[in-house]
């Protein structure tokens, strides 16, 4: 379940007449769930705090995070030789409303040319949001609009994936599905500390969970440039964590919960 509609990121960006219809319907859905569901799955424990007005539903709730799909990925890759190539970062997802890449763009502007990022988003979303990002654009950032198989060449290039895309109450509660896409490709992840993604990455040692500011990101990237063996260390943690986080593993949990 997702409850974006309870937050300002939804309320401040949706027309009043749409909210007049949609929010009562979202509440209606929640009231109906308690009549229809045996188990009510939430992606994080933090989401429970926003559903206190539905105690019957919370009594049958359980945590079920998104899962990893199966990708054609080599389980072991060589340690990146960053003297011979750039450190490549990949971000896939939204850039407006919920997810904010301003701090990421600002930090990238100040990084050496040895670091490069691909930012993948919907073309329409880029057109709507680009005025916010253009002051920080440089040759270190390439904007792409790909999905599905079109993304695979960029995953093959990437040394790091980015989940460093904002902070706040919604980010502390919501678990981005892209984190599991990154994990499924065995690519180390940089995320914002004290968000749902950051806590998961920190717990499983899948990358770096850092404060949401330019200096923290720059320090993290400089550290990786100086110690590229860290990439292989994080990748090995992802290989170990993969099986427990596939969609098959999630399905097995559902089977056990419904017995």
Q: Which ranges hold each PLM region?
A:
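A charged, aromatic-enriched C-terminal amphipathic alpha-helix characteristic of glycosyltransferases
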Residues: 212, 226-258
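Conserved donor-binding/catalytic core segment of Leloir-type glycosyltransferases
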Residues: 69, 81-99, 105-112, 118
């Amino acid at each position: 379940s997702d409850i974006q509609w309870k937050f300002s990121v939804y309320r401040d960006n949706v027309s009043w007449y749409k909210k007049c219809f949609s929010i009562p319907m979202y509440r209606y859905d929640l009231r109906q769930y308690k009549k229809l569901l045996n188990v009510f799955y939430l992606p994080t424990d933090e989401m429970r705090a926003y559903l206190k007005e539905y105690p019957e539903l919370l009594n049958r709730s359980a945590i079920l995070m998104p899962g990893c799909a199966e990708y054609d990925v080599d389980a072991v890759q060589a340690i990146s030789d960053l003297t011979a190539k750039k450190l490549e970062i990949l971000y896939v997802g939204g850039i407006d409303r919920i997810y904010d890449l301003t701090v990421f763009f600002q930090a990238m502007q100040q990084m050496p040319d040895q670091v490069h990022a691909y930012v993948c988003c919907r073309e329409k979303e880029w057109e709507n949001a680009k005025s916010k990002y253009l002051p920080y654009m440089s040759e270190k950032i390439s904007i792409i609009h790909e999905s599905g198989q079109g993304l695979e060449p960029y995953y093959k290039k990437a040394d790091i994936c980015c989940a460093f895309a904002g902070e706040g109450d919604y980010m502390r509660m919501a678990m981005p599905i892209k984190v599991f896409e990154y994990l499924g490709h065995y690519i180390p992840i940089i995320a914002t500390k004290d968000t749902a993604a950051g806590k998961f990455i920190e717990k499983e040692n899948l990358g770096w969970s850092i404060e949401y500011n330019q200096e923290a990101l720059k320090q993290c990237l400089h550290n990786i440039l100086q110690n590229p063996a860290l990439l292989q260390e994080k990748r090995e943690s992802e290989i170990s964590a993969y099986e427990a986080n596939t969609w098959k593993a999630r399905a097995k949990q559902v089977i056990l919960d419904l017995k």
